[in-house]
Amino acid sequence: MMKPQHGGMAGHGGGRTRSPFLTSYALTLAFITFVSVLYFKDFSSTLHQPFLTRPPPHRRQIARPRAPSHHHGGGSSSGGGDVVPPFAVGAAAAAGCDVGVGEWVYDEAARPWYEEEECPYIQPQLTCQAHGRPDTAYQHWRWQPRGCSLPSFNATLMLEMLRGKRMMFVGDSLNRGQYVSLVCLLHRSIPESSKSMETFDSLTVFRAKNYNATIEFYWAPFLAESNSDDAVVHRIADRIVRGTALEKHARFWKGADILVFNSYLWWMTGQKMKILQGSFEDKSKDIVEMETEEAYGMVLNAVVRWVENNMNPRNSRVFFVTMSPTHTRSKDWGDDSDGNCYNQTTPIRDLSYWGPGTSKGLMRVIGEVFSTSKVPVGIVNITQLSEYRKDAHTQIYKKQWNPLTPEQIANPKSYADCTHWCLPGLQDTWNELLYSKLFFP
């Protein structure tokens, strides 16, 4: 501003002699202005964002993660404003919509996502068609939330977002079923020569080599150490949990970018749970009994502490899948009082149905414990929508662990499995919910 003025003064009045005072004043003022400009530029640079070029706040907040790098802060159910969780690629279709509330819609055109024989990773305990199930209707039901829709599962998108990452499921056989379901949903998008699955004791690893990604399952039915930790030989009636000891298992969880926990079925042994104080190697074992809800909360609190100490919410995500219901008494939903899930071919239509085998007390513990976590833990609530699916269990159409007796053969419902689920089927929907929470929170 001063230079034009100073230049004008220099040319004014033709050859008039300049005053030494005016010349000195002009030079001093010009020097001050020059230094001020330099200082302003340096101060702006110090902030790494020049004042006049700072982008609007909303532009900085909605930047989407780029695979494979994820540097966003973690989201939280207790707040977090516009902070985008890691792996998010978009917002939920309808804010405030509870995807766990809705109904099952029969849709032969859109379900199943894959055929049983197309996925070589399904265990024979879950291949219902191969073991003689006469109907396929259980494969064709699509979950429709009330007031919104789930985002369509995109295997290519998920694999791209998992590039260079490690995703791990931790829990029991129901969590393993969900793990296998996810592998089946993804594997067709991976060339045959670029994928593999291996099992190492309690750890199963599926590798998508082109993406340098792994999807893993780790057997830990109680999450804490227990006498049921053998991934194959674990049918123990007298179950004992070693307090809050996670170290044996948790060393395998470290380094995972996405963790998906579950733990419920193995806790359903009665009102009391045996808790070991000390080690399984101790000659004299100190075992106490605790109320199941108290013991369950104790272990989940230990999981929360581990998550807070080991998972960075800026580049990782943690989920907990709620309880999977059973359908062992058909009188619970108004059918023949002597039956169970055997020969059931349609879902329960009563939207208020909640089976007696599903503990609301443990459900409450899940909500209370994970709501205190300093690292966000996403709850994948599969319970209510699964309550309706009395038709989706493996029933008798699976590999049997032991030869059937003549009495069992004469009475199929006596050995029907009303706990586990056929694949493809219900657990694919669980992964649709997980997909929604992971990429469209």
From Swiss-Prot:
Annotated signal peptide: none
Pfam families in the cross-refs: PC-Esterase, PMR5N
SS bond partners: C97-C148, C119-C184, C128-C422, C341-C418
Membrane-side (Lumenal) residue stretches: 41-441
Residue ranges that the UniProt entry lists as topological domain Cytoplasmic: 1-19
Recorded topology in the membrane: Single-pass type II membrane protein
Alphabetical GO biological process terms: xylan acetylation
Positions glycosylated per UniProt: N154, N212, N343, N381
Entry comment describing in which tissues the protein is expressed: Expressed in roots, leaves and stems.
Active site (catalytic residues): S173 (nucleophile), D417 (proton donor), H420 (proton acceptor)
Region annotated Disordered, chain positions: 50-81
Lineage: superkingdom: Eukaryota
One GO MF term: xylan O-acetyltransferase activity
Membrane spanning stretches: 20-40
Cellular compartments annotated: Golgi apparatus membrane
Chief subcellular location: Golgi
Motif (DXXH motif): 417-420
Motif (GDS motif): 171-173
PANTHER family to which the protein is assigned, alphabetical: PROTEIN TRICHOME BIREFRINGENCE-LIKE 33 (PTHR32285:SF62), PROTEIN TRICHOME BIREFRINGENCE-LIKE 9-RELATED (PTHR32285)
Primary role: Probable xylan acetyltransferase required for 2-O- and 3-O-monoacetylation of xylosyl residues in xylan. Possesses extremely low activity in vitro.
Entry similarity comment: Belongs to the PC-esterase family. TBL subfamily.
Official protein name in the record: Probable xylan O-acetyltransferase 10
Biological source species: Oryza sativa subsp. japonica (Rice)
Lineage: Eukaryota, Viridiplantae, Streptophyta, Embryophyta, Tracheophyta
GN (gene name): XOAT10
